[in-house]
Amino acid sequence: MGLPWYRVHTVVLNDPGRLIAVHIMHTALVSGWAGSMALYELAVFDPSDPILDPMWRQGMFVIPFMTRLGITKSWGGWSITGETITNPGIWSYEGVAAVHIILSGLLFLAAIWHWVYWDLELFRDERTGKPALDLPKIFGIHLFLSGLLCFGFGAFHVTGLFGPGIWISDPYGITGKVQSVSPAWGAEGFDPFNPGGIASHHIAAGILGILAGLFHLSVRPPQRLYKALRMGNVETVLSSSIAAVFFAAFIVSGTMWYGSAATPIELFGPTRYQWDQGYFQQEIDRRVRLSTSQGFSISEAWSRIPEKLAFYDYIGNNPAKGGLFRAGPMDNGDGIAVGWLGHAVFKDKEGHELFVRRMPTFFETFPVVLVDEEGIIRADLPFRRAESKYSIEQVGVTVEFYGGELDNVSFSDPATVKKYARRAQLGEIFEFDRTTLKSDGVFRSSPRGWFTFGHLCFALLFFFGHIWHGARTLFRDVFAGIDPDIDSQIEFGIFQKLGDPTTKKQTV
């Protein structure tokens, strides 16, 4: 047929049978990729330390999505929460992967069948005998079925009525587990961090979809609207479908990057704004103050801080610290976290407690400055020693650790104090294993960053695709030079511009 690569889809334009075939094949590829990717991730995933080496540190992409829908067990005998299990059942990680691959194979066969048997009676208009699709009717069917699925997910899966529920956690990502959710029907359901809104919105949207589907099945569109929106043209379907997809992609980019109940930090890692706002630092400080007010010593108060919470308060887990071309999981950057050294408390020789000013997100290097509780600079690591007034040596800074591996250990050696001051810039101080994965020390992004980046890029691309195909549909007659309502017979080749009698070709 000699079509250029960008016009090959023309072959399914007026061929409903093969249009279905290519869509089934596309679904087969998507399902096959999902199953294969899940198996690959399970092959490289190390479930041994859910606290310091969770899935998001290891760069897992599909495992978090399975987990948030209620899958937590593996046929390998482990659970995502760390305990050993004996009977994972069919709906394990491997079970879901296998189902996707089996579905992919069946869809592959169905696509071949529909490609071979393309000329079915079903696709022919009984009045004209030509291939035709009743697009408004198909729209109604799809709307009804997707509404049914949406309602079923909200009413049964999320609520635990017939299903596992979804991943629910506290605001600080400490106590996450899969549990059933009650729908939130009040204003609180619109809080993006309230999981009850997920149930209620799916139920409401599902009911709306079912009713809208039944409406479109029982009511034909008015002729003017049908013509104005080119409802008889399958490219209209393409254009509006692309619009739906890019709109959804923009929405999920936002819910992923800014955080929501649907993107828990235990599965996708913390957001950059939690570092920017000192979210975990404030919670840790609150817990320490509470413990000391209850009579615990400083050391005991810091020892009560969960290692998981301390690990969130570390800049290397900020998804905005990764670079665009730094491929690979976070563990390939700063290494695999081994343990928390404890909270470093700095003091000068006058007894002032000093706080290291933390590095902002978009800095690669940042001056090491130590301030007291009033914000007055007391010490720093000078760039030029000759002019320094606040150097560690001059001020006599010492460091003592509370909680963690170095609990109650103090250092006064200036070189050691400087080392820990530099590391305190990055939040809580952890020990990392950089040899196992040959980690290069350069921060990587979490799946939260990769998901956002990918979906924003494709949303932008699909936005232009929507404009392109929408324009082609609406202005088809202008582009083709044929009035769609023309009644007179047109002979191809007589006119230079098709259907324009003023451009009749001159014969020699």
Curated annotation (Swiss-Prot):
Gene3D superfamilies: Photosystem II CP47 reaction center protein (3.10.680.10). It is a multi-pass membrane protein. Its main location: plastid. Keywords: Chlorophyll, Chloroplast, Chromophore, Membrane, Photosynthesis, Photosystem II, Plastid, Thylakoid, Transmembrane, Transmembrane helix. Pfam families: PSII. GO terms for biological process: photosynthetic electron transport in photosystem II. It comes from the Eukaryota. The keyword Protein biosynthesis does not apply. GO terms for molecular function: chlorophyll binding; electron transporter, transferring electrons within the cyclic electron transport pathway of photosynthesis activity. The keyword Cell membrane does not apply. InterPro entries: PS_antenna-like (IPR000932), PS_II_antenna-like_sf (IPR036001), PSII_PsbB (IPR017486). The chain crosses the membrane at residues 21-36, 101-115, 140-156, 203-218, 237-252, 457-472. GO terms for cellular component: chloroplast thylakoid membrane; photosystem II. HAMAP family: PSII_PsbB_CP47. PSII is composed of 1 copy each of membrane proteins PsbA, PsbB, PsbC, PsbD, PsbE, PsbF, PsbH, PsbI, PsbJ, PsbK, PsbL, PsbM, PsbT, PsbX, PsbY, PsbZ, Psb30/Ycf12, at least 3 peripheral proteins of the oxygen-evolving complex and a large number of cofactors. It forms dimeric complexes. PANTHER family: PHOTOSYSTEM II CP43 REACTION CENTER PROTEIN (PTHR33180:SF37). One of the components of the core complex of photosystem II (PSII). It binds chlorophyll and helps catalyze the primary light-induced photochemical processes of PSII. PSII is a light-driven water:plastoquinone oxidoreductase, using light energy to abstract electrons from H(2)O, generating O(2) and a proton gradient subsequently used for ATP formation. Belongs to the PsbB/PsbC family. PsbB subfamily. This is Photosystem II CP47 reaction center protein.
